[in-house]
From Swiss-Prot:
One of the primary rRNA binding proteins, it binds directly to 16S rRNA where it helps nucleate assembly of the platform of the 30S subunit by binding and bridging several RNA helices of the 16S rRNA. Coiled coil: none annotated. This is Small ribosomal subunit protein uS15. Gene3D superfamilies: 6.10.250.3130, S15/NS1, RNA-binding. GO terms for molecular function: rRNA binding; structural constituent of ribosome. One of its GO terms (cellular component) is cytosolic small ribosomal subunit. GO terms for biological process: translation. Belongs to the universal ribosomal protein uS15 family. Keywords: Ribonucleoprotein, Ribosomal protein, RNA-binding, rRNA-binding. PANTHER family: RIBOSOMAL PROTEIN S15, BACTERIAL AND ORGANELLAR (PTHR23321), SMALL RIBOSOMAL SUBUNIT PROTEIN US15M (PTHR23321:SF26). It comes from the Bacteria. Part of the 30S ribosomal subunit. Forms a bridge to the 50S subunit in the 70S ribosome, contacting the 23S rRNA. It holds the Pfam family Ribosomal_S15.
């Protein structure tokens, strides 16, 4: 489930910390969240797609590690990010 280039640019511009930022933890978490949301809807319609389910779990694990890194280094930025993305209840 690849994201369209235009959607990627929208996400990057919305979460980047400076002009040329494309790979900060915030941007990575936002991109992973978008991919996770797309894959979740795919799996609701295709419940027997086990390879995609495995990929989803890997993406969730990667996002969890990135969020732990952000929380460790900048708790205020972490709280703002999860609120903005609408994750963590």
């Amino acid at each position: 489930m690849a994201l369209l280039q235009q959607r990627k640019q929208e996400i990057i511009s919305g979460y980047q910390t400076h002009e040329t930022d494309t790979g900060s933890a915030d941007v990575q978490v936002a991109m992973l969240t978008e991919r996770i949301n797309k894959l979740s809807t795919h799996l609701q319609a295709n419940s027997k797609d086990h390879s995609s389910r495995r990929g989803l779990l890997q993406m969730i694990g990667r996002r969890k590690r990135l969020l732990a890194y952000i929380l460790k280094h900048n708790p205020e930025r972490y709280r703002a990010l999860i609120t903005r993305l609408g994750i963590r209840g």
